Design a protein with these regions (language model features):
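A short helix/loop element that forms part of the nucleotide-sugar donor recognition site in Leloir-type
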Residues: 181-194, 249-250, 343, 366
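Short hydrophobic beta-strand element within catalytic cores of glycosyltransferases
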Residues: 303-306
């Protein structure tokens, strides 16, 4: 994995490790490529999933351009040293398979897997992520046996830029990485400053620029209703400067929109606790793969309003609540669900039924089939 912070990709990785350890008696070694400092939330979740150690072998330097220059020569030397170190350290685990999450771990896995004795790896594309378009990335993508994306749009770079053969490209949405836990909603609402008699709208998402909390705030502030309504945001504001700035900006925006007293801005709280408080789940964003949080909303039987990204469509269709990122449309969809309890119930029941096929058992079966078809 990339960082020891409990986002969607990391939950998927740890949940998969937990399942493989408990059901197949696998020995799983976890390597982070960009972080030697796990968050408390990540560390506790990793230990609960049977991970004994979190390994880190230094910051990767893996960008090598197709050019002749002193700078590029230095980059090449650094990259070769890093790859050599990764081969040496990962070989100690005697891996049979390397399962990467996100692009940089995929790049590393593709470059080292044969040398460390692994039988297979793959490129694992999971939504918004960076590409370097350099010589090493090109080599890694050519080397990798196959590519898995969690939504169709995740394959576009491989199809259009790298011209990867279509028989090497697969779409495999992730599984639901949490179990539904029913908790005392009244006490949790009190904990989070949510009036107990309110209809609660929530958006669980990183405090990052590609997540559109501002859009939801603007739409929420324009809703006209005699009912008590409350908005909840959950992310982790303390990850870095970007997340702190984003958090502070939406707090300031809520004050300028005169809705600050009807919004709870949460950071680092339990996802399951917040899900138990919600009546409506929202995810509006610039880009997504197959978003974990939409799957979690569905697991908890919530109506969901989501940007009409390919991954959201794959989860929710057919649905009238797949929308463009438009303030007025979002406001009107929120209004419909606030005004109509029966509609909320029906949408929630439909979503709970749709999500049943996204189990970890089905995910493992599909992954096994892909590996076998590519061997």
């Amino acid at each position: 994995i990339k960082v020891a912070m409990l986002g969607g990709a990391e939950r998927q990785a740890l949940g998969l490790a937990d399942f493989l350890i408990k059901n197949y008696n696998c020995k799983v070694h976890l390597v982070t490529t960009h972080s030697n400092h796990p968050t408390k939330e990540f560390f506790e979740f990793a230990m609960a999933c049977g991970i004994k150690d979190i390994h880190y072998f230094g910051e990767p330097s893996l960008t090598v351009r197709k050019e002749f220059s002193l700078l590029n020569l230095k980059r090449t030397i650094r990259a070769l040293k890093y790859i050599k170190k990764m081969k040496r350290e990962v070989a100690k685990f005697h891996p049979d398979i390397i399962i990467p999450f996100l692009n940089t771990p995929s790049k590393i896995a593709a470059l080292i897997y044969k040398s460390v004795g692994a039988q297979v790896t793959f490129w694992h594309q999971l939504g918004l992520d960076n590409y370097t378009y350099d010589a090493l990335e090109n080599k890694a993508i050519n080397n990798v046996p196959f590519v898995i994306a969690n939504a169709q749009n995740g394959l576009e770079v491989f199809q259009n830029y790298y011209k990867t053969p279509k028989e090497k490209l697969f779409v495999l949405p992730q599984y639901v990485s949490i179990k539904k836990i029913v908790l005392d909603a009244a006490s949790l609402k009190d904990k989070f400053g949510v009036p107990n008699d309110s209809i609660v709208i929530g958006m669980i998402a990183h405090y990052r620029t590609e997540k559109f909390q501002e859009l939801l705030l603007q739409s929420f502030s324009e809703i006209k209703t005699g009912k008590n309504i409350h908005l909840v945001f959950l992310g982790n504001k303390d990850n870095n400067e970007e997340t702190i700035d984003k958090y502070n900006s939406i707090v300031a925006l809520s004050k300028s929109l005169n809705c600050y007293d009807r919004v709870s801005f949460l950071s680092g709280e339990s996802v399951e606790e917040v899900l138990n408080c919600l009546d409506v789940g929202v995810l509006v964003s610039e880009i997504e793969g197959t978003p974990n949080v939409v799957m979690e909303y569905m697991l908890y039987g919530l109506p969901v309003i989501a940007s009409h990204h390919a991954g959201c469509i794959g989860l929710l269709q057919p649905s009238e609540f797949l929308i463009p990122n438009d303030k007025n449309i979002l406001r009107d969809k929120l209004q419909d669900l606030i005004d109509n309890e029966n509609l909320r119930i029906k949408e929630g029941e439909d979503n709970a039924d749709k999500i049943k096929k996204f189990s970890i058992e089905n995910y493992i079966d599909s992954l096994y089939s892909i590996i076998n078809s590519s061997s």
